[in-house]
A protein has these predicted regions:
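Gram-positive cell-envelope targeting signals
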Residues: 79, 247-248
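Short, amphipathic alpha-helical interaction segments positioned at domain boundaries
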Residues: 133-162, 252-284
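Short recognition helix of helix-turn-helix/winged-helix DNA-binding domains
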Residues: 1-90, 130-197
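Winged helix-turn-helix DNA-binding recognition segment
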Residues: 1-3, 66-69, 81-128, 183-244
């Protein structure tokens, strides 16, 4: 006979049936539901999987750093991943070497960052303004997402030249339009119900990033060529041959603003499974 579990209704004080198992770890410990324990386990697994992160602060529906160039947006996201608890990045000379930019590109980058009061130098150390990037607890009321340091660094450092930085910027430009729970690119990024998310088509995406919709398929091909450890940075849901209608989802391994719940796990697995199939296909071709 299957066991029946009960919980106390907080409103009436009555015992009511529940499918959620209540677990007491040790006498005197806090009582935790099975679902709470499972959530904590998923949270820990996700943290171990994705690694360290910093918070990027922004406003949904508004362009991300509209006053800086596309290439410098990618460079800023890379720099942000080195943010320490006090907002420091590293020495200015060290940072330039780390970014692997020539003198002209470095000057353009630094001038844009300082003119827009994003980065500043103090005693030879570069700092990022806490209005934009935070390592630690967020104290302001704003929209935010996690930038996962290791994978954004791999993305940047994997570029064959600085000319690739503009292409990578498309991934970051859409942050204000990425749904917190699903990482789908959409028109209502704060929507919590997966089924009510109004997904954005590739044609709309082109408009936001300033890309000619006539060349939407070329953009799709460019994005599908961006991988991190074999995983796509951006995936597409395709229902017909008209590429302008394709829907986009960002790999949560790059950035993610929501909870590490079952929905997060679902979308992570989409990218993991695709990477496994991609690897098998390449092995078959090579053999």
């Amino acid at each position: 006979m299957e066991k029946q579990y009960y919980e106390v209704d907080s409103n009436t004080g009555e015992l009511v049936p529940t499918t959620d198992v209540v677990v007491v770890l040790h006498e005197g410990d806090q009582v935790r539901r099975k679902s709470q324990i499972e959530y904590c386990q998923r949270n820990l697994t996700a943290r171990n999987d994705n690694g360290n992160f910093v918070w990027l602060l922004f406003k949904y529906g508004e362009n991300l750093f509209p006053n800086i160039s596309a290439a410098n947006l990618t460079r800023l996201m890379y720099v942000a991943t080195f943010c320490n608890k006090d907002g420091s990045i590293m020495g200015k000379t060290e940072l330039r070497q780390k970014m692997n930019l020539n003198r002209t590109r470095w000057s353009e980058f630094w001038n844009e960052m300082t003119e827009n009061k994003i980065l500043y130098e103090q005693d030879g150390i570069v700092y990022v303004d806490s209005k934009f990037v935070v390592n630690g607890k967020i104290k302001t009321d704003c929209n935010y997402t996690r930038l996962f340091c290791e994978y954004i660094q791999q993305l940047y450092e994997g570029c064959s030249s600085a000319n690739d930085h503009k292409q990578l910027s498309y991934i970051f430009k859409i942050i204000p339009y990425v749904n917190r729970r699903t990482n789908m690119v959409c028109l209502n990024p704060t929507e919590q119900d997966e089924h009510k998310v109004q997904t954005m088509r590739l044609g709309n995406f082109c408009d936001i990033i300033g890309y000619d919709k006539k060349h939407a398929r070329r953009l799709a091909n460019e994005l599908l060529n961006i991988r991190i450890n074999g995983e796509l940075a951006i995936g597409f849901f395709v229902t017909n041959l008209d590429e302008k209608t394709w829907q986009l989802v960002v790999n949560p391994k790059l950035y993610f603003g929501g909870k590490y719940d079952l929905l997060f796990q679902k979308y992570r697995e989409l990218f993991i499974k695709e990477a496994q199939e991609y690897k098998k296909l390449n092995e078959t071709i090579q053999n």
